[in-house]
């Protein structure tokens, strides 16, 4: 994506809404405001756009319910507030989306869920299945069980990692600012808004400041970091004011709202770089001529029936190569099954996986979305 003209072509979008927008000045959830974003998301769904909602607000809502005026610093108190507030947050979204005939699903994640390869695949598979079913996944950090070592730190980062996982076309971060400004607008009200920039533009570092609300964990600098993280998988980011009327449909229509941050690589190139440079090969599937031809010519998923040998020892989520019988690498990808499981189901049709293993994770050994040609 290189310009706003391409935004109307987005088919999968991550929308992140921060605490400062979701709460009514620290007095609990702002139901009317949340209702407006829910209505906008419903409009996007009517256009066939898949939407994942990453929502802050559980700690802020918990603080309100517990009568706390300032955000606590102790982790156990934050976790207690999150536990109390998450109830209200989920109930609110479920009720409001139901008015539009939409089902919601709650997903609470920790950093481990997206850094561990096996759990990453499980999380990704669940989210994609929900999207296929027309459900709106509502994702938040699992504050109740996280420790300092496994916290995302802010939901901007969580939104970016979810965008990476599901290969979203666009990450929209709604905030209490109109976007990125050339100078701090709190100090210089005449500072111009930056409508668009390349994600690696060195000037961006001088443009970010801190949010003033005190309810959330992330200032503008975390939003820029999140945009850069999303860009690693080729996802563009728009940072815009959540208080702008009809902001979500207007952004997807290509209107110049907020700041568009453009990735420097396409999603396919980004994924190839990631698999080539960040992951270590753990094994190999040797495939027959038919599977080799399908992989080379069509880039389709690798099915168990096309595998004639399994080399190495690996677990679900590891990177494995696909080679022909002569040892020529055709592709590489993330396996849905361990080496032990793969040896049991190779040469077999996918319909027999459950019969052989007693369960079925996926019908493919490697799904085409997790496969890149060599």
From Swiss-Prot:
Residues engaged in binding substrate: 56, 143, 155
GO biological process, one term: L-proline biosynthetic process
Keyword Membrane carried by entry: no
Keywords: Amino-acid biosynthesis, ATP-binding, Cytoplasm, Kinase, Nucleotide-binding, Proline biosynthesis, Transferase
Subcellular location: Cytoplasm
Pathway: Amino-acid biosynthesis; L-proline biosynthesis; L-glutamate 5-semialdehyde from L-glutamate: step 1/2
Record-listed E.C. numbers: 2.7.2.11
Source domain of life: Bacteria
Segments passing through the bilayer: none
Function, as annotated: Catalyzes the transfer of a phosphate group to glutamate to form L-glutamate 5-phosphate.
Name of the protein described by the UniProt record: Glutamate 5-kinase
Lineage summary: Bacteria, Pseudomonadati, Pseudomonadota, Gammaproteobacteria, Methylococcales
């Amino acid at each position: 994506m290189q310009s706003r003209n391409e935004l109307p072509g987005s088919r999968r979008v991550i929308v992140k809404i921060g605490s400062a927008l979701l709460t009514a000045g620290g007095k609990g959830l702002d139901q009317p405001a949340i209702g407006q974003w829910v209505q906008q998301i419903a409009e996007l769904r009517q256009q066939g756009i898949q939407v994942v909602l990453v929502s802050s607000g559980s700690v802020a809502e918990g603080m309100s319910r517990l009568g706390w005026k300032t955000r606590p610093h102790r982790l156990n108190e934050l976790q207690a507030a999150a536990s109390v507030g998450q109830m209200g947050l989920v109930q609110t979204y479920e009720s409001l989306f139901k008015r539009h005939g939409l089902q919601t699903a709650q997903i609470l994640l920790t950093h481990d869920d997206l850094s561990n390869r096996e759990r990453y695949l499980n999380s990704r598979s669940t989210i994609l299945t929900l999207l296929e079913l027309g459900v709106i996944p509502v994702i938040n950090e699992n504050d109740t069980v996280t420790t300092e070592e496994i916290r995302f730190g802010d939901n901007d980062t969580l939104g970016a990692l979810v965008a990476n996982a599901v290969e979203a076309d666009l990450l929209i971060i709604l905030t209490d600012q109109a976007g990125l400004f050339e100078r701090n607008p709190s100090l210089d009200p005449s500072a111009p808004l930056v409508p668009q920039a390349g994600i690696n533009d060195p000037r961006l570092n001088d443009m970010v400041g801190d949010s003033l609300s005190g309810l959330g964990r992330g200032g503008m600098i975390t939003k820029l970091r999140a945009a850069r993280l999303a860009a690693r998988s080729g996802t563009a980011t728009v940072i815009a004011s959540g208080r702008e009327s009809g902001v979500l449909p207007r952004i997807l229509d290509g209107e110049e709202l907020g700041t568009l941050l453009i990735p420097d690589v396409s999603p396919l190139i980004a994924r190839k770089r990631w698999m080539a440079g960040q992951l270590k090969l753990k094994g190999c599937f040797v495939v027959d001529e038919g599977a080799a031809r399908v992989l080379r010519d069509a880039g389709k998923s690798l099915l168990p029936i096309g595998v004639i040998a399994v080399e190495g020892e690996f677990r679900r989520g590891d990177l494995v190569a696909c080679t022909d019988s002569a040892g020529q690498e055709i592709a590489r990808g993330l396996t849905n099954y361990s080496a032990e499981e793969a040896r049991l189901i190779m040469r077999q049709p996918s319909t027999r996986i459950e019969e052989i293993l007693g369960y079925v994770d996926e019908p493919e050994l490697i799904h085409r979305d997790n496969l890149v040609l060599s």
